[in-house]
Regions:
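N-terminal auxiliary segments of SAM/dcSAM-dependent transferases
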Residues: 1-76
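SAM-dependent Rossmann-like transferase core, predominantly class I methyltransferases
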Residues: 47, 57-126
Length: 126
């Protein structure tokens, strides 16, 4: 049976929320968008379009994976970091959001200190 895209998002939000996924609506939207390989614009403008049974089943499988605790990045094998997508799998740690902040601050301050001798210490890396 073909469902509307927005219905799948609602169903996904409900299932994810009931399984304890934080920010379930965001994750449901992300899973649907990534499963269908849509750009943000395509995703936004296709909310009232019907999705094929095959696509719907793929989305549902990905929702189920997420309810089992599998991160979205591991479901799709990709993680965005600093505006780039990196391939990830079960053997790779996902970059943390605060790491992006550290990179941004380093780049921002690099030109202020580039002629000075500095020491860096990186703690807690795998």
């Amino acid at each position: 049976m073909n469902k509307l895209l927005k219905s799948l998002i609602y169903d996904g939000k409900k299932v994810l929320s009931e399984s304890g996924v934080k920010n379930a609506i965001h994750e449901a939207r992300l899973i649907v968008k990534k499963t269908l390989k849509k750009t943000e614009l395509e995703f936004i403008t296709s909310q009232d379009k019907k999705i094929s049974s095959k696509q719907s089943n793929s989305i549902i499988r990905n929702f189920i994976e997420r309810t089992k605790g599998k991160p979205v990045s591991k479901i799709f094998g990709l993680k965005e970091f600093f505006s780039n997508e990196f391939i990830v799998n079960k053997n790779v740690l996902d970059p943390r959001p605060e790491t992006e902040l550290l990179v941004e601050l380093t780049i921002k301050n690099f030109f202020k200190i580039r002629d000075k001798k500095i020491s860096l210490l990186e703690l807690g890396v795998g």
